[in-house]
Amino acid sequence: MFDQLDIVEERYEQLNEMLSDPEIVNDSDKLRKYSKEQADLQKTVDVYRDYKSKKEEIAEIDEMLNETEDKEEIEMLKEESASLKSAIPELEEQLKFLLIPKDPNDEKDVIVEIRAAAGGDEAAIFAGDLLRMYSKYAESQNFKTEIVEAAESDHGGYKEISFSVSGSGAYSKLKFENGAHRVQRVPETESGGRIHTSTATVAVLPEVEDVEIEIRNEDLKIDTYRSSGAGGQHVNTTDSAVRITHLPTGVIATSSEKSQIQNREKALKVLKARLYDMKLQEEQQKYAAQRKSAVGTGDRSERVRTYNYPQSRVTDHRIGLTLQKLDQIMEGKLDEIIDALTLSEQTEKLKELNNGEL
């Protein structure tokens, strides 16, 4: 572990020198790239230097203890040494987790897609509830949300809806929402008071830079059409909605706001995210075939969470976490669940680094 930490510290110092080089300072792309790399290493280096400093102080105190016979000084030095030594295990634990390879997509903005699945109108209403939950959570994290495309249901909620979430670390926070979400409750339209089970699927797609995925113009078919709302009524009076089809894969993205130019930009952004996601899914399936992770495979059909309204209970099936806080969670208070899933993923990665042992 310490060999790796020495390499990290050496790279950090190298980046310090590079960032004072006029050639790099005047190149915005390089400056952004190396500044981000340095920022990513900052915490690891800070903790490692704190660790080394405390170890050096302990060694110095040991030397002083060997040289003095003064009882008061010995007592004082022993107390100081004990205090320093008590901090070492926690710092070592921090360093283990800081060395875990980061997901390269963690800092990216995302496109979230929610689709009503089994359960008819109730599933569509639940999709709307999930949209509200994620919007509230995004607001609490100072993330910006924007609707990209929505197909409303006649009885409330959405057949499907996609929206962007922008902010540092958006993907790292929302990536665990991938999968099938199940709700158990009595629908408002149910006169007999029977509990119904409905599901909605959630897909979280990291947004991509042009350099990460190449799309040729000749591979795109772009159509404009008149947008329709719930029940088929026309929302716009002009053909401003845009549908883009990627011909080699058949992947389609649409956007139906008022501006055709904005719709084209939004649809293209979603298309890129979906194509990149296809690539990620292929890689994850290969990985999952070798080893299923503690937080699930990321498969969109995998049941990840159940929201039980009669018992005010939310259960995340991947880590066996149950919370009696349904009202709070539906108001966007997802931190406890997301933190637990993040810790589970980190622990699993740490086990892999240590050949199955913690």
Swiss-Prot record:
Localization: Cytoplasm
SUPFAM superfamilies (alphabetical): Release factor
Post-translational modification: Methylated by PrmC. Methylation increases the termination efficiency of RF1.
Gene Ontology CC entries for this record: cytoplasm
Protein name (record): Peptide chain release factor 1
Alphabetized UniProt keyword annotations: Cytoplasm, Methylation, Protein biosynthesis
Family per similarity comment: Belongs to the prokaryotic/mitochondrial release factor family.
PANTHER family cross-referenced by the UniProt entry: LD18447P (PTHR43804:SF7)
Residues found modified as N5-methylglutamine: Q233
Species per Swiss-Prot/TrEMBL record: Staphylococcus haemolyticus (strain JCSC1435)
Gene that encodes the chain: prfA
Protein's job: Peptide chain release factor 1 directs the termination of translation in response to the peptide chain termination codons UAG and UAA.
GO molecular function, one term: translation release factor activity, codon specific
Taxonomic lineage of the native organism: Bacteria, Bacillati, Bacillota, Bacilli, Bacillales
Stretch forming the signal peptide: none
InterPro entries, A to Z: PCRF (IPR005139), Pep_chain_release_fac_I (IPR000352), Pep_chain_release_fac_I_sf (IPR045853), Prokaryotic/Mito_RF (IPR050057), RF-1 (IPR004373)
